[in-house]
Regions:
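PLP-dependent class I/II
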Residues: 1-188
């Protein structure tokens, strides 16, 4: 997610903090989000040499190779820097618009509070005021309004939802309208 940041935020890699930190850091990155290669299962690892060798040995025994098209796609993403940068800029402009819209709409719903994310393409609204476990909230929301949300507890954030805005503006608008309608039924 290091390229999916907003409002001038600059992520800091822990490996850049000191030589000691670099010697103890393993960096794992994927192509799924930044390069829209979701499901292709290709990524990179940067680690001190002994750890990198151990990772390579373990990987060779636990999974098969990356698909050929995935390798070519990753190579093109890295080699075609100008095209990649232009595509990323277009994607981030759309994500930023959706992020701001969803954030504003969520905060209009009585009982929900939500901070504005600085990276990725998820928001984590707080739904704890409704008195339901987040898992139950998500299950009931799906059943009642056909809106899929991920319980925050899956990420260590009980009482929150994870909502993605990596979809169309229309779907986000419909989804937040349905979420608001569902929340209104919980307040009755």
């Amino acid at each position: 997610y290091e390229h999916l940041v907003y409002d001038g935020a600059k992520p800091t890699c822990v490996a850049t903090l000191s030589d000691e930190a670099r010697a103890r850091t393993i960096i794992v990155a994927g192509f799924s989000k930044t390069y829209a290669m979701t499901g292709w299962r290709i990524g990179t690892t940067v680690a001190p040499l002994p750890i990198a060798k151990a990772i390579a040995e373990l990987q060779s025994q636990t999974s098969s190779n990356v698909t050929t098209f995935g390798q070519y796609g990753a190579l093109a993403a890295l080699k075609e820097k100008e095209k990649t940068a232009a595509s990323l800029k277009l994607m981030m402009t759309a994500f930023d618009r959706r992020r701001k819209f969803l954030h504003a709409e969520l905060n209009k719903i009585p009982g929900i509070t939500c901070l504005l994310a600085q990276g990725a393409f998820y928001l984590f609204p707080n739904i704890s005021s409704f008195g339901l476990k987040d898992v139950d909230f998500c299950s009931r929301l799906l059943e009642a309004e056909k809106v899929a949300a991920v319980p925050g507890s899956a990420f260590g954030a009980e009482g929150y939802l994870r909502l993605s805005y990596a979809t169309s503006d229309e779907i986000i608008k419909k989804g937040v309208e349905r979420l608001a309608r569902f929340c209104a039924t919980l307040r009755k």
